[in-house]
Amino acid sequence: MNFWGIIKEDFSQPKTQDPAFNSCIELFFNYPGVWAVVNYRFAHFFYIRNFKRIARMISGISQFLTGVDLHPGAELGRRIFIDHANGVVIGQTAIIEDDVLIYQGVTLGGTSLEKDTKRHPTIKKGVIIGSGAKILGNITIGENAKIGSNAVVVKDVGANLTAVGIPAYIVEERRKNKENTRAVDANCEDKLEKLERKIAELEKALSDIK
C-alpha cells in the first residue's frame, strides 16, 4: 500500500478500535494518538532518507502537540492505534508490526546506551499493550499477546499469552503452576489418608495381640 493509503488507515482506527467514537470531527480534537502516528509517518519518511534534522524537528513538534514521544527511527507497521496517547514513549530501534493497540503511558524503552544496536522491543502483530506498561530492552512480544496495565516486561512474551505484574509474569504459566500444585497437594493428601488408615490398622492389630 502507498504512503497516503497507510495514512488513511491510520485515520480510520478510532472507528474500529474505540466504541466511544461518534464522528469524524472528533479526529481533530480528541485523538492525539492518531495524529502522533500520522506525524511519525512524515518524520520517518525524512529519517530514512537521511534528512534526520527535519525528521527530529517534525517529531519534536508532534511530541509537543500530542504528548507522544515517538522517535522517527522506529519502525511502525499499518493500523497502529494509540488510544488516549498522553505519555507514550517509543524508542529509536523499536519495531511495531500491524494492528497493535497501545494505551496511554506506555514505554517501549531501551536498557542499553550503545549506539548502532537494537536496544528496544519488537512488538508483533495484534498485540494489546495496557496503560502504563513498560516493555524494556531488545525483547519480543509475540503475536496477539496482551500486556496488562502497569506491567514491567523485561523478557520475551510468547504469542497469544498474557503478561501482568512487576516484573511481568505469564498468567497462563502461573495458572498452570497453581493447577500442578493443587494436583500435588491432592496426591499428598490421598497418601496421608492411606498412611493414617494403615497406622490405625496396625494399632488395632497391636491392641488385639495384647
Give the positions of each predicted feature:
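Terminal amphipathic alpha-helical/low-complexity segments used for targeting or macromolecular assembly
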Residues: M1-Q63, K178-K210
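Structural signal for interior beta-strand "rungs" in well-ordered beta-sheet cores
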Residues: Q63-V171
